[in-house]
Structure formats: structure tokens, C-alpha cells
Swiss-Prot record:
This is Autoinducer 2 sensor kinase/phosphatase LuxQ. The gene is luxQ. Residues 490-712 form the Histidine kinase domain. It comes from the Bacteria. CDD domains: HATPase_EvgS-ArcB-TorS-like (cd16922), HisKA (cd00082), REC_hyHK_CKI1_RcsC-like (cd17546).
């Protein structure tokens, strides 16, 4: 765009400043005009409103005063001797003479007509009523309309001369001697064409004219016909007249006895002085506008003469420097701001030139390849590093035709097209030969669109190789972890299977042996098996924690169940060992808590088992407390497990929760254990979003503190569980199908079931189980997992899907993996029991079976 085009498109600074000043002055003038007009108009309106209110009040006062004087005269006349004598002797001459003298004494406050009545009807009238078209009949009608009180009454009466609007009042005439009411004395004020009343209101209120209305009808007025307005225009302007009209109208509604009537009075006053004030105000505002306009023109001329030359010099310098040619120093300006702008431009141009050289050096000497492409995909420029990687020695067309560059351009082209549409691309891997480069593409966005694309590359060949090695190592680690998990699962199955036989036989022997020495030997066998099972469970739990497969399942449960379990398990153990065991509970027994009951029990079992193991004598105390904190959605279950055992050295407290760690090697040899119990406890507490800490003193004991967030549920009445004897659990013998390939396990389960008077049929694989189920009906199926020919999971699925049987299936497996349990449940099993199966555990499962599935025949 040329300078001439720029000049046509843009305005000069002098013109812009002039227009801004003109605009500012104009806005100020308009603001002053609006403000002045608003306040002046408001003041005039307030003054007009005040005048109207004063006039209205004066008119109302004059009208009421006129009625008050008439009322005073009326009441005074009714007590006069002449009127009383008329009722007694009928001397109307004296009566008429009396009223004539009264009218002459005060002609202004004289009623239009008078009349007297008795109980028998009209007695006398002054004859003036006929001038208003009111005859004797109408007088009777008036007297009948005004029967009560001595107040003024407004009425509209159809007379012989048309509709008449009048005010009527009566006053009783009383015989002062006897107190007898002789009759009624009536007076009437006719409002129609009542010129004396109108003139009195006009002169008293200092008004130019008075118009009396009944509703919208004019009944009397003082207009002569020479006024610049007529009755119709006055009626149109009476409610909302302009404050600047030539006349001011005050509308006064008339009240009779504090009651609104249809009568109202318009008072018209000249308003020329207000209109004159308005015209003078407008003239003053117009003069102000003209003066402001002249001042703006003078300022414009001064700015153009003072600023234009200096500004033109500055513009010439900027145009010269902007051409890209070598520029000269700025010559300066008399105006401080222009001089500052000129020297700033001078410094800016120098800095831009320096930056251009720096950017060019950065581009040329960068170790990473850099290129500039056009939006159409043509190479504009590349730095030496890019030329080196692409095998280009000189920027000639022959060098750009080599296969390496053409292959690179072919792979980069799709990304160039995306960047040409405005997208910024990062992390694009495009190789050059054997090397892999990661490229970033950034479009150069200017006012008219995209002028080019900057492409920057980084050699990531080493990084890619390292990533490949990392992925390989990760896959090997995952395979190793999977192999270890599979090994643990197999070892768990291989250990649990014979362990089920050992513990099962031990439990059977415990019931049948009576000799104390033999019973002691059986206890050793049971304890050894239990210890081996605990070590195995700890190893499997630790493996699950390492693999992140330990799941938390929160639900509502009765806290009493946990207390009862701890009491039943550890009190006999402690009693046998000679250790005092106490539980201090501050939580209501019927309280419902919401957390993972299984993991909470596991935490307590580990901590209390450790306390029992490492406390040869003394006491073990467990305390529970539920705390609620303000502005917290959860309660805190505070647990404290204390013992008076061997204690822990202070230097070993920091590592006590690490895996395979005990206080010292002597403890391991003397007390045994895997060293995983506290590690599992700490991980479980953290999974429950809680905290655990320990205080201990060597040879004095240890105390573990736990804080676990829980949700408190509704309290329920605690029911004492019943524990029937095995032979009484079922009313009749159950038919049980036992699917087990191991003879020892089958023997033990059959022995356990015989205590419950069950009829057990034993098959050794899934195929035999299906054949047996086709021929016979069973109440319960006990299903092993790893079976010959057809496994337990597959057999369970066949029972549900092929045979369509709903017989409860309780899986009995030595595989403690969660995945195995889920596979069994998905196939259709109702429960999963992990071997080795203890007698009490089987009893609990049979209680569950009775409560949920068994129907007594």
C-alpha cells in the first residue's frame, strides 16, 4: 500500500485532535444544555405546581367559606322570632319583610331561594324558586330528599327549565317555650349560571376566569369570549396542562361534608411570564452553542498551524525509515512529545536491525535443522544444519533434487498442508535417512493471512532407542510380575490343598481325642497349620497390594459384629496364654458404620494377633471411639491397640511398617511370622484414607493409634444371634452333591457334613457331576475348581445354562485370587469358599445357605 493510499485511508493527527476537541466541547455543551434544561424545567414545573396548589386551595377555601356563611345565616334565621311567629299565626308579611332586610344587609351571601315546610307539607316559599323552574311539587320533592341532618346536600334536579344542580340545606324551627319542632326551614344555592358566586371566586382567587363543572359539563363560567382559549380547550387541558402554556389551569374538586361530589372548579390564570422565561432560557443556550462552536474553530486553526508542520516532519522520517533503506538520525522537533516519538522510533529501528541480524545468526548457527516453507509447500530457506542433514551443499536446484530431500519433503508435505491452514503442530516424527527427527511446525500469521511456516527439528534417534529399551524392560517387568502372580496362585493352590487336609483332620481329631496328651499334640498340629495359613495369606495379600488388586468395598454394617468377633476369637486365646484381654468401647452397640468391614476386621486381626504373639504376660487393651468434627462430612473412628509385651526399640520404629521387617532377628526366630502383617495393616489403613502411628518402649510394650474416616449410619436394635447345634440346623437331612477330585478333601468335607445329618454323594469331576444332576435332585452343590476332564467353573456354567438348574452352588477352591472368585460368580456360583475350610467357616456358610436358599420340604 503506497503512502498516498495510506493518506487517503487514514486521517492526520492534527485533524484527529481537532475533531476530538470539537467532539469533547460539543459533548460538554450538550451536557450543559441538557442539565440546564432539566433543572430549569424542573424548577418551573415545581413553581407552576405550587401556584396551582395554592390557587386550588384558595378556591376551595372561598367556596367553603361562602357555604359556611350561608350556613351561619341559615341557623341564625331559623331561631328568629319572625319565622317562629309565622308558624304560629301565619303572618307572612312580617316573614317576607324579615328576609328582605336580611338580603339587603348581605346580598353576597344570599341563597337563591327559601321555603318552609311542616309535617303536612309545603307551608311557604319566597317565590324565587320559580325563576329556576322549581314549582311547589319539586319543592316537596326537595324536602323529601333532605329529611335528615342539617348538612349541605348536593342534588341534580330536573326542573321545568331543565337540569339544575344545587346545594340544599335545612334547619329546624323550634318553639323556645315548649321545645316543639314547628317545621323545617330550607335554603338552596343553585350552581347553574351562578354568576355572583363565579365572580366572587374569580376576584378572591386572583384568577382571570372561573369555570364551574358538574362532571364534564360546564354549568357556570366567567369567560367573555375574547380569551385565546375556549371551554373545550380548557376541558382538554385541565388534567395535564403544559407548564409553559399561555394560561395556567388549576382544577379543584369540591367536597361537601368531606365527601367527594361531581362539582369541580377550574381557575384560569395568565402564564405569560413563565413562557417568557422559557424563551429567554432557550436563547441563552443557543448563544452558548454558538460561542462553543466559534471556540472550537479557533482551536482547530491554532492546532493545524502549530502541530501540522512538526507532525509532517515526523511522518517524513518514519516513512523514510520504514522503506528499509539506511536511515538518518532524527532531526528533532520543537514539540516535546513529537521529539520523544522521533527518538523512540530511531532507537526502535536500530534495535530491529540488531534483532534481525541476531535472528539471522541464530538461524544460521543453530545446531538443529531449521527451515522456512511457504504456505504452498515451497522451501524458502534452510539453515546450514538442515542442509548438512539433507546432504545439500549449495542452495541450488540441483541439490534440491537429491532423493534424500525429496523423500523428506514427501513425508513432511501432509503436515505442511495442515500448518498452512493455521494449525500449530508439535512432536511430528519424520526421519531423514537413518536418523529420526521430531519436528515442530508453526505458521507465521500476519494481518492478511499466513505468510510462511517455520519448521524446527530435533534429533531424537537416541531418545527413540532409549524408549524402545524402556518399553522392553517394562514388558519384561510386567511378564515377571505376571509370572510371579501365577506362581503364587499355583503355590497357593498346591499349599492350600494339603493344608486343607491337615487342618481338616486336626479338627476331626480334636472332636474325637479324649486323652490330654494327645489333645495337646492335636493343638500343636492345628496351631502349626494356622500359622502356615496366616503366612500364606500375608504373602498373597502383599502380592495383591503390590499389583494394585486390593479392592475396597464399603457398606453399612453393625459395629457390634466386629466387637463380637474380636471378643469370641481373642479372649479364649488370651485366657489360654494367661494374658488379660480387655475391649473398651465408647461406640453404641447398635451403631451402624459405613466402611469396608472385611478390611477393618483384617486390620484388627493383624494388630491384635501381633499383640498376642509378642506379649508373653500382662495385658492387651483395645479401645474404640467415634469422633465428629465441625464442618466435616465424615466421622473419625479412633482405635488404640496397647500391649505390655516386649516392645520395639525406638531406632526401629521408622522401619517397622516396611515389608519383611521385624524388630530384630531374635524376634523372628523366637516368635515367627513373615514380617508382612504391619505392612499390610499400613496399606489397608491408607486405602481406607486413614492414618496409623505407633509408640513403643523396649520391654514395656507398644501402642498403635489408628484414625479411619467412616460415615455414621442409623442405629438399629441389636439382636442376639442364635447359634444352633449342627444336628439341629436343618429339620431334615440335606442332599448334597460334593464335586472334589482330592480324596483327602472329600473325606474331610463329608465328615464335616455328616455332623449336620446331610446325605453326601461324591463325584470326582465336572462331567460326573452333570450326569449325577441329570438323574437326581440335590439341595446343595459343593464345587471344587481344578477338576479333571471339566473344571469347576465350566461345570457351574453348564449347570446354569445347559441343565437350567437353580440349585445353590457353593464353590470350594484353593485358589485365593480375586479373578477366580469373580469367574465362579459370573458362571453362576452363589458363594465362594477358600480352602482350607475350617469347621466354623463351613458352619457360617451353612447358616447363610439356610437363610437365603433353603426351603424346608
Amino acid at each position: 500500500m503506497t503512502n498516498e493510499q495510506l493518506q487517503r485511508k487514514h486521517q492526520s493527527l492534527a485533524t484527529l485532535i481537532t475533531r476530538i476537541i470539537f467532539l469533547v466541547l460539543g459533548l460538554i455543551t450538550i451536557g450543559i444544555f441538557i442539565q440546564s434544561y432539566y433543572f430549569s424545567n424542573k424548577i418551573i414545573k415545581q413553581e407552576v405546581m405550587l401556584t396551582k396548589q395554592q390557587t386550588s386551595a384558595l378556591v376551595k377555601s372561598l367556596f367553603n367559606n361562602h357555604l359556611s356563611i350561608l350556613q351561619i345565616h341559615h341557623d341564625s334565621n331559623s331561631k328568629n322570632e319572625a319565622i317562629r311567629r309565622f308558624f304560629l299565626d301565619g303572618d307572612d308579611e312580617k316573614l317576607e319583610y324579615y328576609f328582605l332586610s336580611m338580603d339587603q344587609a348581605d346580598p353576597t351571601h344570599t341563597p337563591e331561594f327559601r321555603f318552609l315546610t311542616t309535617g303536612e307539607g309545603l307551608l311557604w316559599d319566597d317565590g324565587n324558586a320559580h325563576f329556576y323552574g322549581v314549582n311547589e311539587v319539586l319543592l316537596e320533592k326537595i324536602s323529601q330528599s333532605v329529611l335528615f341532618g342539617n348538612n349541605w346536600h348536593f342534588m341534580s334536579l330536573h326542573t321545568l327549565m331543565g337540569l339544575r344542580n344545587m346545594l340544599v340545606r335545612r334547619s329546624p324551627v323550634i318553639d323556645t317555650t315548649t321545645g316543639e319542632v314547628l317545621g323545617q326551614y330550607y335554603i338552596s344555592v343553585v350552581l347553574d349560571n351562578n354568576f355572583p358566586l363565579v365572580e366572587m371566586l374569580e376576584s378572591g382567587s386572583n384568577s382571570d376566569n372561573i369555570v364551574m363543572l358538574v362532571g364534564d359539563k360546564v354549568i357556570s363560567h366567567s369567560l367573555s369570549g375574547n380569551e385565546p382559549y375556549d371551554l373545550d380547550s380548557l376541558l382538554a387541558m385541565r388534567d395535564e396542562p403544559s407548564a409553559f402554556d399561555d394560561c395556567l389551569i388549576s382544577h379543584t374538586p369540591i367536597e361537601i361534608n368531606s365527601t367527594d361530589t361531581l362539582v369541580s372548579i377550574l381557575a384560569i390564570q395568565e402564564n405569560s411570564h413563565v413562557a417568557s422565561l422559557q424563551r429567554q432560557h432557550y436563547l441563552g443556550l443557543a448563544t452558548s452553542v454558538v460561542l462553543m462552536l466559534m471556540l472550537s474553530l479557533a482551536i482547530r486553526s491554532w492546532i493545524q498551524n502549530r502541530v501540522a508542520n512538526a507532525l509532517e516532519s515526523l511522518m517524513a522520517y518514519s516513512r523514510f525509515a520504514g522503506t528499509g533503506e539506511k536511515y538518518e538520525r532524527f532531526n528533532g522537533s520543537d514539540i516535546l512529545e513529537f521529539a520523544h516519538i522521533g527518538h523512540t522510533l530511531e532507537n526502535t529501528f536500530e534495535q530491529l536491525e540488531s534483532q534481525r541480524r541476531s535472528f539471522q545468526d541464530l538461524f544460521n548457527f543453530a545446531l538443529s535443522p531449521m527451515m522456512v516453507w511457504s504456505e504452498s509447500g515451497l522451501l524458502i530457506q534452510m539453515n546450514p544444519a538442515a542442509m548438512k542433514e539433507l546432504g545439500i551443499e549449495h542452495a541450488s536446484p540441483q541439490d534440491f533434487s537429491n532423493p534424500l530431500f525429496q523423500l523428506f519433503k514427501l513425508k513432511l508435505s501432509p503436515h505442511l498442508k495442515m500448518a498452512a491452514q493455521g494449525a500449530t503442530l508439535t512432536g511430528i516424527n519424520v526421519p531423514i535417512g537413518e536418523k529420526i527427527f521430531r519436528w515442530n511446525l508453526s505458521p507465521i500469521v500476519v494481518e492478511n493471512g499466513i505468510s510462511g511456516i517455520i519448521v524446527q527439528g530435533q534429533d531424537i534417534t537416541t531418545l527413540i532407542d532409549a524408549e524402545k529399551q524402556s518399553n522392553l524392560a517394562r514388558r519384561e517387568a510386567e511378564q515377571s510380575a505376571k509370572t510371579r502372580a501365577d506362581f503364587l496362585a499355583k503355590m497357593s493352590h498346591e499349599i492350600r490343598t494339603p493344608l486343607n487336609g491337615i487342618l481338616g483332620i486336626a479338627q476331626l481329631l480334636k472332636r474325637s481325642v479324649n486323652d490330654a496328651e494327645n489333645l495337646k499334640q492335636v493343638d500343636v498340629l492345628c496351631n502349626s497349620g494356622e500359622h502356615l495359613l496366616a503366612v500364606l495369606n500375608d504373602i498373597l495379600d502383599f502380592s495383591k497390594i503390590e499389583q494394585g488388586k486390593f479392592n475396597i468395598k464399603k457398606r453399612d454394617f453393625n459395629f457390634y459384629d466386629t466387637l463380637n468377633t474380636l471378643e469370641n476369637i481373642y479372649r479364649p486365646i488370651c485366657r489360654e496364654k494367661g494374658v488379660s484381654f480387655e475391649i473398651h468401647n465408647q461406640i453404641p452397640l447398635d451403631c451402624q458404620l459405613h466402611t469396608d468391614q472385611v478390611r477393618l476386621n483384617q486390620i484388627m486381626f493383624n494388630l491384635i494377633s501381633n499383640a498376642v504373639k509378642f506379649t508373653p504376660a500382662g495385658r492387651i487393651e483395645v479401645s474404640f471411639k467415634l469422633e465428629q468434627f465441625a464442618r466435616s462430612e465424615h466421622s473419625i473412628l479412633s482405635i488404640q491397640v496397647s500391649d505390655t509385651g516386649i516392645g520395639i526399640d525406638e531406632s526401629k520404629l521408622e522401619s517397622i511398617f516396611e515389608p519383611f521387617v521385624q524388630a530384630d532377628s531374635l524376634s523372628t526366630r523366637e516368635y515367627g511370622g513373615s514380617g508382612l502383617g504391619l505392612t499390610i495393616v499400613k496399606n489397608l489403613v491408607e486405602m481406607l484414607e486413614g492414618e496409623i502411628s505407633v509408640q513403643s518402649e523396649l520391654c514395656k510394650g507398644s501402642t498403635f493409634y489408628l484414625s479411619i474416616p467412616v460415615e455414621k449410619g442409623e442405629c438399629e436394635e441389636q439382636k442376639t444371634p442364635t447359634n444352633p447345634k449342627p444336628e439341629q440346623l436343618f429339620g431334615q437331612g440335606l442332599k448334597v452333591l460334593l464335586v472334589e477330585d482330592n480324596h483327602t478333601n472329600a473325606f474331610i468335607l463329608k465328615a464335616f457334613c455328616q455332623k449336620y445329618q446331610m446325605s453326601v454323594e461324591w463325584v470326582q469331576d465336572g462331567t460326573q457331576a452333570l450326569e449325577k444332576l441329570k438323574e437326581h435332585a440335590f439341595d446343595l452343590i459343593l464345587m471344587d475348581n481344578q477338576l479333571p476332564k471339566m473344571g469347576g467353573i465350566e461345570a457351574t456354567r453348564e449347570i446354569r445354562e445347559t441343565l437350567k438348574l437353580g440349585t445353590p452352588i457353593y464353590a470350594c477352591t484353593a485358589d485365593a485370587q480375586e479373578s477366580t472368585k469373580q469367574e465362579f460368580l459370573s458362571a453362576g456360583a452363589n458363594r465362594v469358599i477358600v480352602k482350607p475350610i475350617k469347621e466354623q467357616e463351613l458352619h457360617d456358610e451353612l447358616l447363610h445357605f439356610k437363610a437365603h436358599y433353603w426351603v424346608e420340604h
